[in-house]
C-alpha cells in the first residue's frame, strides 16, 4: 500500500477511511482506561489540530515545539503539524527545573513559531516567555485544551521527500541537545528498513511505553506502526516507571507481538515479577527490540530466565543499534535466531545483528580516518538513505559529523561517535569515544565499570564512571547511587569497600569511590547517564562526595 507514497502524511491520508484500530492509549496504564482511535479517528483529529494551528498562523515550514504529555492529543498534534507542512519539534514537557532548562535550550535553538503544550504547564510557559524576551523570540503558546474544532478545514500541504519533516533533538548525554534535521525521505526509508527487519505479519500488535519525544518512541513506534498498518498500544512512561509490571500486563491483555525497551527496562520488568505470575503470558511476543543504550548480556540472560516460565521465546529478543542522526534503526538481529555474543577482555559484548542493506557501515580509525580490519575496534561510520540531513543551524558541526570521508574514498559518512567492530557480518558496539577511560595505558569502557559497580551490592542502582587528571596519570572515579536518601557512615564504608573490590578485581585498577544518595547522578530525558556532565559536576564539587 505504501510503495507509491512519499511522506508519512500521504500514508495517513491513504488510511484515513479505515476503521481498523490504529492507537490504543491506556490513560492510567491499565486496560480499564483504554481510549481507542481508528485510522479514521487519527486522521480526523489530526485535521482538527491542523485547522486550529493554521488559524493561529502556523504555515508550511513553521517550526512547532510539541511538549504535550503522552496521549492521543500528542499524536493528533504531531500529525496535524505535519499535515500543514510545518515542522514538529518533539520535546519533553517542562515538569521539573532540569526539563525547563532543556526546554529553554531547545526553544532558543530552533526559534519556533508556536509551542503546543498542556495547560498544566502554564506557569512554566510564562517563565519561558520571560526568558526569551531578551533574545527576541516570541513563540505563540497553544494549550491543547483550547483546541477549536470549528476552525476552517485546511488542505494538507504537498511535501517532497527532501523537505524537512521534523527536528529531533538528541538526548544530550555528552553535551547540549542538538537538533537533527529528519526529512520525509529519512522517515519513509527507516520505516522500510524496519519492515525488512520485521517481515510481514497480518496479526502484529505493538506496545510502547517509551517517551514519544525520543527517537525510538517516536519513529520506532508511533510513526512506524502507522506506516506498517498495525495497531499500537501506548502507555505513559510515567505509568511504566511507577509500576513496570503494567508493561507485562498489557502484553498479556492485548496479546502483543512486538514491543521495545532499553536495557534498564528489562531489569525493571524482572524486579516487578513476584512469586505469583500466573496472570502473565508473554508467549505472543515475536519481536522485542532492545536498544537506545548499551545492551548487557547478563541483563538479557536474567530477563530470559525469569520470563521463560511466562512463555517468552528467547529468539524474540532483538538487540539493535541506531541513533537519531540515522533517523533511528541501523542494525538488528535477524528475526527467529538467537543473538550472538563475543567474549572480550572486559566482558561479554552482545551483537547488534546485521546491518540493513540500505546502510553501509564501516569501522574507522577516528584519528587517521582509515578503515580498520574486521574484528578490531574503531569508530562506527554510517552511510545510507536514513542518515539525516544534518544538525539544525550548526553548519560546521554538520560538516564534521555528517560529511566525514574515509581515507582514499569519496563517499561521505556519518561519524557516530560510537566505538565497535564487525565480525561475521554483525555489528558489535563497545562504547562512546568521548567516554572512553584510559588509565595506566588501559582502555576501559565506563559502562562495563558501571555494571560492575551495580553488581557489587543490591543497594546500588546506578553508577557513573569517568577519569580525571591525577599525579602523572589519570584517576578512575566511580560515583554510585544508593537506593537510600540518607546513608550511615558504616553503610558508606561497606558500600565503598564492595565497589572498590569489584572494580579492582575485574579491571585491575583501583577506583576512587564516592557513594551518594539516589537522584544525584545526572541523566538524559531517556534515562542515560550523562557522564561528561557528571564529570563536570564532580570537578566543580557539585556532587555530594563520600567523606574521606
What annotation goes with each model-predicted range?
Residues 256-260, 272-346, 360, 369:
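Gly/Ser/Thr-rich phosphate-binding loop
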Residues 83-151, 262-263, 268, 495:
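Structural core segment of the AMP-binding/adenylate-forming
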Residues 359, 367-375, 379-439:
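Conserved ATP-binding/catalytic segment of the ANL
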Residues 23-76, 95-104, 156-158, 179-185:
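Conserved AMP-binding/adenylate-forming core of the ANL superfamily
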Residues 188-205, 215-257, 272-275:
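Conserved AMP-binding/adenylation subdomain of ANL enzymes
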Residues 142, 464-466, 477-478, 500-548:
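Conserved C-terminal "lid"/linker of ANL adenylate-forming enzymes
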Amino acid at each position: 500500500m505504501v510503495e507509491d507514497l512519499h511522506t508519512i502524511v500521504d500514508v495517513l491520508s491513504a488510511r484515513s477511511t479505515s476503521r481498523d484500530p490504529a492507537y490504543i492509549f491506556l490513560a492510567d496504564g491499565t486496560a480499564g482506561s483504554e481510549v481507542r482511535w481508528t485510522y479514521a479517528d487519527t486522521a480526523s483529529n489530526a485535521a482538527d489540530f491542523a485547522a486550529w494551528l493554521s488559524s493561529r498562523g502556523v504555515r508550511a515550514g513553521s517550526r512547532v515545539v510539541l511538549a504535550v504529555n503522552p496521549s492521543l492529543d500528542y499524536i493528533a498534534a504531531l500529525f496535524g503539524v505535519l499535515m500543514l507542512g510545518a515542522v514538529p519539534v518533539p520535546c519533553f514537557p517542562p515538569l521539573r527545573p532540569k526539563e525547563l532548562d532543556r526546554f529553554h535550550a531547545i526553544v532558543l535553538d530552533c526559534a519556533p513559531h508556536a509551542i503546543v503544550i498542556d495547560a498544566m504547564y502554564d506557569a512554566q510557559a510564562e517563565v519561558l516567555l520571560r526568558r526569551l524576551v531578551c533574545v527576541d523570540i516570541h513563540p505563540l503558546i497553544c494549550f491543547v485544551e483550547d483546541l477549536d474544532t470549528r476552525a476552517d478545514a485546511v488542505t494538507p500541504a504537498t511535501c517532497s521527500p527532501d523537505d524537512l519533516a521534523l527536528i529531533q533533538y538528541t538526548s544530550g548525554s555528552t553535551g547540549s541537545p542538538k537538533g537533527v534535521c529528519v526529512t520525509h525521505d529519512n522517515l519513509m526509508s527507516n520505516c522500510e528498513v524496519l519492515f525488512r527487519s520485521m517481515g510481514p505479519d497480518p496479526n502484529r500488535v505493538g506496545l510502547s511505553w517509551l517517551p514519544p519525544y525520543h527517537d525510538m518512541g517516536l519513529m520506532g513506534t508511533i510513526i512506524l506502526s502507522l506506516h506498517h498498518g498495525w495497531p499500537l498500544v501506548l502507555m505513559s512512561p510515567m505509568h511504566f516507571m511507577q509500576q513496570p509490571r503494567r508493561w507485562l500486563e498489557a502484553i498479556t491483555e492485548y496479546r502483543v507481538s512486538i514491543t521495545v525497551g532499553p536495557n534498564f527496562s528489562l531489569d525493571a520488568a524482572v524486579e516487578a515479577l513476584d512469586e505469583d505470575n500466573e496472570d502473565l503470558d508473554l508467549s505472543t511476543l515475536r519481536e522485542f527490540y532492545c536498544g537506545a543504550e548499551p545492551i548487557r548480556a547478563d541483563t538479557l540472560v536474567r530477563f530470559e530466565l525469569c520470563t521463560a516460565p511466562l512463555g517468552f521465546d528467547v529468539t524474540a529478543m532483538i538487540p539493535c543499534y541506531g541513533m537519531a542522526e540515522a533517523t533511528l534503526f541501523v542494525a538488528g538481529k535477524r528475526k527467529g535466531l538467537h543473538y550472538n555474543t563475543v567474549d572480550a577482555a572486559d566482558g561479554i559484548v552482545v551483537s547488534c545483528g546485521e546491518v540493513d542493506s540500505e546502510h553501509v557501515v564501516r569501522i574507522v580509525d577516528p584519528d587517521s580516518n582509515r578503515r580498520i580490519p574486521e574484528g578490531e575496534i574503531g569508530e562506527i561510520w554510517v552511510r545510507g538513505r536514513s542518515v539525516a540531513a544534518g544538525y539544525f543551524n550548526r553548519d560546521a558541526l554538520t560538516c564534521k559529523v555528517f560529511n566525514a570521508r574515509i581515507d582514499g574514498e569519496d563517499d561521505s559518512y556519518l561519524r557516530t561517535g560510537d566505538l565497535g567492530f564487525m565480525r561475521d557480518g554483525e555489528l558489535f558496539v563497545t562504547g562512546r569515544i568521548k567516554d572512553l577511560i584510559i588509565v595506566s595505558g588501559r582502555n576501559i569502557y565506563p559502562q562495563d565499570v558501571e555494571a560492575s559497580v551495580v553488581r557489587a551490592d543490591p543497594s546500588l542502582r546506578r553508577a557513573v564512571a569517568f577519569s580525571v587528571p591525577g599525579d602523572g596519570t589519570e584517576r578512575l572515579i566511580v560515583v554510585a547511587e544508593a537506593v537510600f536518601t540518607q546513608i550511615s557512615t558504616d553503610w558508606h564504608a561497606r558500600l565503598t569497600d564492595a565497589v572498590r573490590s569489584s572494580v579492582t578485581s575485574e579491571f585491575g585498577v583501583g577506583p576512587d569511590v564516592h557513594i551518594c544518595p539516589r537522584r544525584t547522578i545526572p541523566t538524559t530525558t531517556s534515562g542515560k547517564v550523562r557522564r561528561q556532565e557528571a564529570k563536570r559536576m564532580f570537578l566543580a564539587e557539585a556532587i555530594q562526595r563520600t567523606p574521606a
